[in-house]
Amino acid sequence: MATTKSFLILIVMILATTSSTFASLEEMVTVLSIDGGGIKGIIPGTILEFLEGQLQKMDNNADARLADYFDVIGGTSTGGLLTAMITTPNENNRPFAAANEIVPFYFEHGPHIFNSSTGQFFGPKYDGKYLMQVLQEKLGETRVHQALTEVAISSFDIKTNKPVIFTKSNLAKSPELDAKMYDICYSTAAAPTYFPPHYFATNTINGDKYEFNLVDGAVATVADPALLSVSVATRRAQEDPAFASIRSLNYKKMLLLSLGTGTTSEFDKTHTAEETAKWGALQWMLVIQQMTEAASSYMTDYYLSTVFQDLHSQNNYLRVQENALTGTTTKADDASEANMELLAQVGENLLKKPVSKDNPETYEEALKRFAKLLSDRKKLRANKASY
């Protein structure tokens, strides 16, 4: 009798634990963040293709798209372009691009985007005309409010000297942010020295003209927009009625996938203190941006990793990054076919690499695990909505 009673208690405890786990998963806020990096967007494009393919297999649905699984998708520069591609609706109100169309997009349009050089020493390297043309063609007249999930795309206004963050959740208070997606995408990609800044205007809540003078989102968030995406998710959880049950959002209630465009370990070995002690302004100017971006991206990842680990939620955060780019693959604007092939191979090879020295799990295995969480969470929410 005692044995039976103990067995029943054990079953109840298991069921309670399982129920609690699923309830927690159902309440998770899911966030996808995509770094900037020009043509190196091919690397996260390869990762997104793998992830979406896994979700389609798990849910037995060839039409499944990433926007169906993430509450917030954020990006800067080329990451902002990817964000728009997978969240902007087509005529059927589905993302106009599947993840497996991202890499072909770069192969088709990259050589033209990074080929229209102005030939001027004093001025941007590229005129940006083809970039704007293809963005208008692909994104049409779609505006922020039409995005299929919450987005967070950064830019920087050089007239007001302030960051500009385009999100759906800001529109009620700031309707002037409901800009056309092609204006936003060009702006977030308009890296100083590469493309001209972008001017456009919208209307305020009072109908007044509101002007933007924007450059690359990396100026506002550096290349890694993960913290920006997390802050947008936090605000949404606090303000959106659909998330009323989880307004006290913390990292335990968040699934965060952050995709990089690659860094180079060689950069750290390029210069010595003795050498740089002789440098002037021009020499520092050539490398300081790369140093700043590398340091900021590292610190963002370090901060997020530490926070998630301290909350015993390290499996809720996954940073996918190649840290050993070499040669032409380090360049943001080398759109030669040979280099794009190398970048695609970098993405494929990255899937087979371990997540870290301390974690032998490969990125492929980690992404499959992450996809399972996304799939289960979506099913739980669908079941709840059907009642």
UniProtKB/Swiss-Prot annotation:
Chief localization: other
Q: Matching PROSITE patterns, A to Z?
A: PNPLA
- Glycan attachment residues as annotated in the record: N115
Residues forming the motif GXGXXG are 36-41
Q: In which tissues is it expressed?
A: Tuber and stolon.
Q: Where is the active site?
A: S77, D216
PNPLA domain location: 32-230
Q: What is its EC number?
A: 3.1.1.-
Q: Write out the coiled-coil annotation as residue ranges.
A: 361-385
Q: Give its localization.
A: Vacuole
Q: What InterPro entries does the record tag this protein with?
A: Acyl_Trfase/lysoPLipase, PNPLA_dom
Q: Which UniProt keywords apply?
A: Coiled coil, Glycoprotein, Hydrolase, Lipid degradation, Lipid metabolism, Plant defense, Signal, Storage protein, Vacuole
Which residue positions does the secretion signal occupy? Answer: 1-23
Into which EC class is this enzyme placed? hydrolase
Give each disulfide bond as a residue pair: none
Which GO cellular component term is one of those annotated?
A: vacuole
What does the entry give for GO biological process?
Answer: defense response; lipid catabolic process
General function of this protein: Probable lipolytic acyl hydrolase (LAH), an activity which is thought to be involved in the response of tubers to pathogens.
Q: What else is known?
A: Patatin have a dual role as a somatic storage protein and as an enzyme involved in host resistance.
PANTHER family (alphabetical): PATATIN GROUP D-2, XYLOSE ISOMERASE
Domain notes from UniProt? The nitrogen atoms of the two glycine residues in the GGXR motif define the oxyanion hole, and stabilize the oxyanion that forms during the nucleophilic attack by the catalytic serine during substrate cleavage.
What is the protein name for this chain?
Patatin-02
Q: Which organism is it from?
A: Solanum tuberosum (Potato)
